[in-house]
Swiss-Prot record:
UniProt xrefs under SUPFAM superfamilies: Cell-division inhibitor MinC, C-terminal domain
InterPro entries noted in UniProt: CAP/MinC_C, MinC, MinC_C_sf, MinC_N, Septum_form_inhib_MinC_C
Name of the featured protein: Probable septum site-determining protein MinC
A Pfam short name: MinC_N
Gene: minC
UniProt superkingdom: Bacteria
Keyword terms of this UniProt record: Cell cycle, Cell division, Septation
C-alpha cells in the first residue's frame, strides 16, 4: 500500500459543513495571508469555492480582532469571491463585532463556548450506525445523496458535479468524479473506499482535499481515504 503525505500548514482552516456552508476557522490576523490562501483555493477549484458562503470563526485566536482588521478581512474575502455570511458565536466582544460588521451571530456554535465556562457533563455515547444505504444507479451531476446515521454503498458512478454524503463510511464500486464526504456528523474514524478515484473533492469529518491537492499517481486508482491527526490521507489499495 503506497501512502502519500499531504500535510501542510494553513492560516485559516476551512471545514466543509453538512449543508454546504463552510466554516473558516481563523488562525492568524495576517489578513493578506488569509486572503491569498482563500484566493488560491478559489483559483484551484472555482466550481467548488467561487462565491461560496462561509461562517467566520475567531475562536482559536488569543483575542478578538479589532473592527478595522475584521472589516479588512471581510472585504478581502468578498474581493476573492468568498462570501462571509455569519460569525460563529463566541464572547461578548464577538457579539459586538458581529453587530458592527452587520453579520449575524450563528447560535449553533454557542454550546462550544459555554462548555468552556462550566464543568463538562459526562460524555454521551455516539449514536450507533444503522444498516447501510445502497445506491444501485448512477448519481448524476447536480444530485445529492445523503445516508443519515449509516454507511453509503454506491454500486455505480458518482458523476462530476454530484455529491454523496454519509454519517458513516462511503464505498464506491464505480468511478468517483464528484464529491464524497464521509463522517458528516464529525466522526473522524469514517473512511472512503473507491475503485476508480477521480474525485472533485473528498472530505472526512469536514476536513477536505480538492482535485488539485491530490497526487496524479492516485487518480484512476482504487484507493482508501481516512483522517490521521486531522489530515486527510490517501493510499492506493493493492
Amino acid at each position: 500500500m503506497s501512502n502519500v503525505n499531504m500535510d501542510f500548514e494553513q492560516a485559516g482552516e476551512l471545514k466543509i459543513g453538512q449543508v454546504g456552508i463552510a466554516t473558516l476557522r481563523i488562525r492568524t490576523l495576517n489578513v493578506p495571508r488569509l486572503i491569498q490562501e482563500m484566493s488560491d483555493r478559489v483559483t484551484r477549484a472555482p466550481k467548488l469555492f467561487r462565491r461560496t458562503a462561509v461562517i467566520l470563526d475567531f475562536g482559536e485566536l488569543p483575542h478578538t480582532p479589532d473592527l478595522t482588521t475584521a472589516k479588512a478581512l471581510v472585504e478581502g474575502l468578498r474581493a476573492a469571491n468568498v462570501l462571509p455570511v455569519a460569525i460563529a458565536y463566541g464572547t461578548n466582544e464577538i457579539d459586538l463585532l458581529s453587530q458592527q460588521l452587520g453579520l449575524p451571530l450563528l447560535s449553533k456554535f454557542r454550546a462550544h463556548y459555554e462548555r468552556q465556562e462550566v464543568a463538562a457533563p459526562p460524555p454521551q455515547s455516539t449514536p450507533p450506525i444503522n444498516t447501510g444505504r445502497i445506491q444501485h444507479t448512477t448519481v448524476r451531476s447536480g444530485q445529492q445523496l445523503y445516508a443519515e446515521h449509516c454507511d453509503l454503498t454506491i454500486l455505480n458512478t458518482v458523476g462530476a458535479g454530484a455529491e454523496v454524503i454519509a454519517d458513516g463510511n462511503i464505498h464506491i464500486y464505480g468511478t468517483l468524479r464528484g464529491r464524497a464526504m464521509a463522517g458528516a456528523r464529525g466522526n473522524a474514524e469514517m473512511r472512503i473506499f473507491c475503485r476508480d478515484f477521480q474525485a472533485e473533492l473528498i472530505a472526512i469529518a469536514g476536513r477536505y482535499k480538492v482535485l488539485d491537492d491530490i497526487p496524479t499517481e492516485l487518480r484512476g486508482k482504487a484507493v482508501q481515504v481516512w483522517l490521521e491527526q486531522n489530515q486527510i490521507k490517501i493510499a492506493a489499495l493493492d
